[in-house]
Amino acid sequence: MKISANSIRTGNILVYNNDLWVVSKTPEHTQPGKGGAYVQVEMKNLKTGTKRNERFSSADYLDKAELEQKDYQFLYFEGDDLVLMDTKHFDQINISKEMLEEKLSFLTENIIVKVEFYNDKPLNIELPPTVILEISETDPVIKGATATASYKPAILENGIKVKVPQYLEIGEKIVVKTDDMTYVERAK
């Protein structure tokens, strides 16, 4: 499938120079005073792991990889792999931890993730947009802090540090965005 260079987003998997590349940073759209507009894209080769910056004209069209997406349930870690189970057919697969990198700490028991396949080979794991986690460390509640819009640091059960409202206490569950690791709301 062809997409415009202006439509490239972080996480897109492109077929470029006969290799698969994942867009690793938000593309920069630039309109210089002289010359045509272009898009600066940082990509990572899925086979070799090498990173590369590439500049495409805004008028260019690139091949976006046709991916098949399936729901899988995270079961457990086995060495350097994640063990996932297909939610429809109950088949289990092992996928390298490296595929998730810094998002690995969001994996909780039984979480449902989307695994993207290219030619029956797992390429990418998409976490749900938000997860519910428990606060394990934070400063004590300050009386009257509900009226102010200030935040305090908190460490969650998975070790991630986030800023939370002053009124939250240790042991409370909160909703956290998985893409930028920010607090959304108190879990219901």
Swiss-Prot record:
List the keywords (alphabetical): Cytoplasm, Elongation factor, Protein biosynthesis
* Ion transport in keyword set: no
Question: From what superkingdom does this record's organism come?
Answer: Bacteria
SMART domains cross-referenced by the UniProt entry: EFP, Elong-fact-P_C
A Pfam family reported for this protein in Swiss-Prot or TrEMBL = EFP_N
A single GO BP term for this record reads: peptide biosynthetic process
The GO terms this record gives for MF are: translation elongation factor activity
Which terms in the GO cellular component ontology are assigned?
cytoplasm
- Give a yes or no for keyword Protein biosynthesis in this entry: yes
**Localization terms from the record:** Cytoplasm
- Pathway assignment: Protein biosynthesis; polypeptide chain elongation
* InterPro entries the record matches: Elong-fact-P_C, NA-bd_OB-fold, Rib_uL2_dom2, Transl_elong_fac_P/YeiP, Transl_elong_KOW-like, Transl_elong_P/YeiP_cen, Transl_elong_P/YeiP_CS, Transl_elongation_fac_P
User: Main localization of the protein?
Assistant: cytoplasm
Q: What does this protein do?
A: Involved in peptide bond synthesis. Stimulates efficient translation and peptide-bond synthesis on native or reconstituted 70S ribosomes in vitro. Probably functions indirectly by altering the affinity of the ribosome for aminoacyl-tRNA, thus increasing their reactivity as acceptors for peptidyl transferase.
Question: Which NCBIfam families does the entry mention?
Answer: efp, PRK00529.1
Q: Which PANTHER family match?
A: ELONGATION FACTOR P (PTHR30053), TRANSLATION ELONGATION FACTOR KOW-LIKE DOMAIN-CONTAINING PROTEIN (PTHR30053:SF14)
User: Which family is annotated?
Assistant: Belongs to the elongation factor P family.
Protein name, per record? Elongation factor P
Q: From what organism does this protein derive?
A: Rickettsia peacockii (strain Rustic)
**Upper lineage ranks?**
Bacteria, Pseudomonadati, Pseudomonadota, Alphaproteobacteria, Rickettsiales
